Structures are given as structure tokens and as C-alpha cells.
């Protein structure tokens, strides 16, 4: 389902760089990347990013999948599955934000079905862990000013409350948890609670050793790559067996494959109680990876985003347990409100930084897999150009609002395209330096 016309020949003539012509030698990339296009305002931004910040400098073989809602509907969501399978094949995917349809969207687009979240589908196929990390600009005030370094949060995106079975209990009676083993073996029959009054509520949830182990491997790999310490948070003092299993598996994985590497890198792995960890996070300066169980990761990633200032400055990378397959995207949605203005021909000022960083993080991973130092250098220069532009006072409206508050006026910010043009100009300066 990808478009072959987006695959550029590896035998493209080399353009040598000269300051006189401002021509750039395009960086050759040996292996393909998977591109997943998206919806609404982020789809508009996505094209600007490719045309102004990526294609003029990098010669890419792109396996293109259109994950825009109309095409997902046309293919009965097969395109989403195919894009995830291609990611497993090529190891690097870069994804634009997409709509997860609700009833209103089914009506708006005339959909055949209320298709599932593309992120959920992709996550299940890749069996990955989602890592979110803020982009820090020195001049954008943070709600928690002590956070001078990023905190990268890894959320175990499987099981627990999100795959649980819950029930309302009507009246008195016994609640039991029963496990029936396959084949031989005795049934385990645990009495949970004896309801005597009007009843109440009950919940049964689970996780698997395989999934916890994958989560541990991905977390260890990310922390080592960043050369930051790793913390796992649980409540094993209360859930001695359930959370205790997370603690034990992480420790096993660490000692079996990572301890010597961590010691050589001067970093460490440590288990912490979730309440201690939240208190530590609040008073720390940042600079670590925080591995969270599913629910904790859901809550704490939003707490971090707000503390650092903005979801518009938050990257999201799905890391697979093989350590070499990733999918990079922005942590925010499709910016529908701005898209409605754009549809009417109005001016928008949409923050493209997290979408640009989806490209840089994806390409940086491709560079590491291919041992392509030139490509890695390009991604670092593009990230520095983004941050440099904001720190020089040129930014989109959302960031200007954090800076100027009620005194905000039009001269304080650039529109959507002007901001990307400013980043492109800064990038060219950095490349030709």
C-alpha cells in the first residue's frame, strides 16, 4: 500500500556544496524508512517539514503509508497493519498524528466503522514501549523550574487496568479468583472478598512475564543509549506478588545483560516505590529514564508534559524489545481547532517542533543502525536549529503565550509556515558553517 514514487534512486547525482551556489550535497541513506502520514493540521505541517527540512538535504528511500482517516476507511484499516509490518521489516518508522474516530468522526467522514486507534494497533503489532521526552528551550518558562534536564518516561503499554475485567457486584456473596491450568495440574482457587451488604465493585487484571521482560529490555536499551540512569517505579510493598514480579524480572534482565554495560557507562538501574519516585521526580533536576507500569505511565507522562511546559514540546518514541525497531511521532494530536481555521483560509500558528523531532529521532535511529555519521550530524543540527530559533525569540503562538501571557500580541509570534521557514534558514546556516 505504499507509493513507489516516493522512493528516490540511490544513484542520484552528487551535488557538491559551495557557498556560492548554496547547493548542498544530499546525504545518502542506505536503508529505507517507513513514513506514516496522518490527519488534519498535522498532515499540513508534515508536508511542509518534508519539503523544507528533509528532502532538500537527505536522499531517502521512503516506504509511504497513508494513515489519514479516509484511506484507513477505504482499506478497512489494513493500511495501519501493513505500516506496522513494514516497520518490523525496515526497523524505523516516522509517524504523523492521526485521528482516532469517535461517533462524531464516523458521521463527519461517513466511515464504514469506528476504526481503532492506529497507535494502539501499531503498538500491539510492534509489542513496544512508549517513551516520551520533553524538548527543552531555555527561554520557555517551565512550571517546575528545577527541571533543567529532560526526564524520559517509559510507559509499559500492555495489560493491567487497560486489559482488565471489572464488574459491579449486586448483593452479598463470595468473590473468587480462579486459575485453571492447561492439561494436568490443580486449579488455584483464591477467595478475594466476602460481600455481606449491598455489594460493590470488583476487578481482575493481569500481565505476562513475556511482556514485562520486553518492557525491561526496551527500558534498559533506551537508558544505555542516552547514558542516563534508569528507575522502575512500582508499589511492591502492597502488591507483593503482582508488582513484585515487575521488580524481580527487571532485576533479572539487568543482571543478565545490562549491569556490566551500565557500570562501564557510569550509570545505574534502581527500583523505587512509586510514591518515593514521584517525590524524587518533583525535586530532581531531570536527566534519567523513568520506567512506569501502564496506569502510572498514563498519568505521569501528562504530569511531566505540563511540568515541562507544553505537549507541543514532547517527543514520543515506541521502542521494540529487539532494541533496533522504533516508531517516532509527536506526543500531541492532529490540532483540529487550527485545521478548522486553515480550512476556512485563516492564518494558523501551529507548533511543528514535536513533528520535526519525530523526523529527527527516526532518522537518528536510522543513522545509528546504518553507521551513518553524516546523517546523525544532520539530525543533531536540525534539532539545534529548532531550539535555536525559539531561543532567538521566533516561535509559534502557543509558546509565545507561555512567555507573554495576557500581553501577547501578533508581533510576538510567527505563523505555521513562517516558523518552519525560520528553522530551514537556521539549518542552512548550521550546515554551511
Swiss-Prot record:
It is found in: Plastid, Chloroplast. Coiled coil: none annotated. The keyword Oxidoreductase applies. Its EC number is 1.1.1.42. Mn(2+) binds at residues 275, 298. Keywords: Chloroplast, Glyoxylate bypass, Magnesium, Manganese, Metal-binding, NADP, Oxidoreductase, Plastid, Transit peptide, Tricarboxylic acid cycle. One of its GO terms (cellular component) is chloroplast. NADP(+) binds at residues 98-100, 105, 283, 333-338, 351. One of its GO terms (molecular function) is NAD binding. Substrate binds at residues 100, 117-123, 132, 155. Binds 1 Mg(2+) or Mn(2+) ion per subunit. GO terms for biological process: glyoxylate cycle; isocitrate metabolic process; NADP metabolic process; tricarboxylic acid cycle. Residues 1-21 form a transit peptide. InterPro entries: IsoCit/isopropylmalate_DH_CS, Isocitrate_DH_NADP, IsoPropMal-DH-like_dom. The record marks 162, 235 as: Critical for catalysis. It is an enzyme of class 1 (oxidoreductase). Its cofactor is Mg(2+); Mn(2+). It catalyses: D-threo-isocitrate + NADP(+) = 2-oxoglutarate + CO2 + NADPH. Detected in all tissues examined. Belongs to the isocitrate and isopropylmalate dehydrogenases family. This is Isocitrate dehydrogenase [NADP], chloroplastic. It comes from Medicago sativa (Alfalfa). The lineage of its organism: Eukaryota, Viridiplantae, Streptophyta, Embryophyta, Tracheophyta.
Amino acid at each position: 500500500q505504499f507509493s513507489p514514487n516516493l522512493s528516490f534512486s540511490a544513484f542520484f547525482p552528487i551535488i557538491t556544496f559551495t557557498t556560492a551556489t548554496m547547493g548542498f550535497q544530499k546525504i545518502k541513506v542506505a536503508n529505507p524508512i517507513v513514513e506514516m502520514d496522518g490527519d488534519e493540521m498535522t498532515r499540513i505541517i508534515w508536508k511542509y517539514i518534508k519539503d523544507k527540512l528533509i528532502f532538500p538535504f537527505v536522499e531517502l528511500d521512503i516506504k509511504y503509508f497513508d494513515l489519514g482517516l479516509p484511506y484507513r476507511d477505504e482499506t478497512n484499516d489494513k493500511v495501519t497493519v501493513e505500516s506496522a509490518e513494514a516497520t518490523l521489516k525496515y526497523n524505523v518508522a516516522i509517524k504523523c498524528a492521526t485521528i482516532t474516530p469517535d461517533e462524531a468522526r464516523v458521521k463527519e467522514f461517513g466511515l464504514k466503522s469506528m476504526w481503532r486507534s492506529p497507535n494502539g494497533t501499531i503498538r500491539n503489532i510492534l509489542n513496544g514501549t512508549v517513551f516520551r521526552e520533553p524538548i527543552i528551550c531555555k527561554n520557555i518558562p517551565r512550571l517546575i523550574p528545577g527541571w533543567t534536564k529532560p526526564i524520559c518516561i517509559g510507559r509499559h503499554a500492555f495489560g493491567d487496568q487497560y486489559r482488565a475485567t471489572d464488574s459491579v457486584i449486586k448483593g452479598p456473596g463470595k468473590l473468587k479468583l480462579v486459575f485453571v491450568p492447561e492439561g494436568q495440574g490443580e486449579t488455584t482457587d483464591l477467595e478475594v472478598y466476602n460481600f455481606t451488604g449491598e455489594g460493590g465493585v470488583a476487578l481482575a487484571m493481569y500481565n505476562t512475564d513475556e511482556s514485562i521482560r520486553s518492557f525491561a529490555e526496551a527500558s534498559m536499551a533506551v537508558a544505555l543509549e542516552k547514558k542516563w540512569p534508569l528507575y522502575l517505579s512500582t508499589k511492591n510493598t502492597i502488591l507483593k506478588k503482582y508488582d513484585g514480579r515487575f521488580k524481580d524480572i527487571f532485576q533479572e534482565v539487568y543482571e543478565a545483560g545490562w549491569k556490566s554495560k551500565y557500570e562501564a557507562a557510569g550509570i545505574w538501574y534502581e527500583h523505587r516505590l512509586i510514591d518515593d519516585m514521584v517525590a524524587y521526580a518533583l525535586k530532581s533536576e531531570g536527566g534519567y529514564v523513568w520506567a512506569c507500569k501502564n496506569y502510572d505511565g498514563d498519568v505521569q507522562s501528562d504530569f511531566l508534559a505540563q511540568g515541562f511546559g507544553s505537549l507541543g514540546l514532547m517527543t514520543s518514541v515506541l521502542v521494540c524489545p529487539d532494541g533496533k525497531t522504533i516508531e517516532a511521532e509527536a506526543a500531541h494530536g492532529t490540532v483540529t481547532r487550527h485545521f478548522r481555521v486553515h480550512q476556512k483560509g485563516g492564518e494558523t500558528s501551529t507548533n511543528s517542533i514535536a513533528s520535526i523531532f519525530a523526523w529527527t529521532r527516526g532518522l537518528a535511529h536510522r543513522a545509528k543502525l546504518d553507521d551513518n555519521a553524516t546523517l546523525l550530524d544532520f539530525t543533531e543540527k536540525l534539532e539545534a536549529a529548532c531550539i535555536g530559533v525559539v531561543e532567538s525569540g521566533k516561535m509559534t503562538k502557543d509558546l509565545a503565550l507561555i512567555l507573554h501571557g495576557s500581553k501577547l500580541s501578533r508581533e510576538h509570534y510567527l505563523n505555521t509556515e513562517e516558523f518552519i521557514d525560520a528553522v530551514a534558514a537556521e539549518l542552512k546556516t548550521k550546515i554551511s558553517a
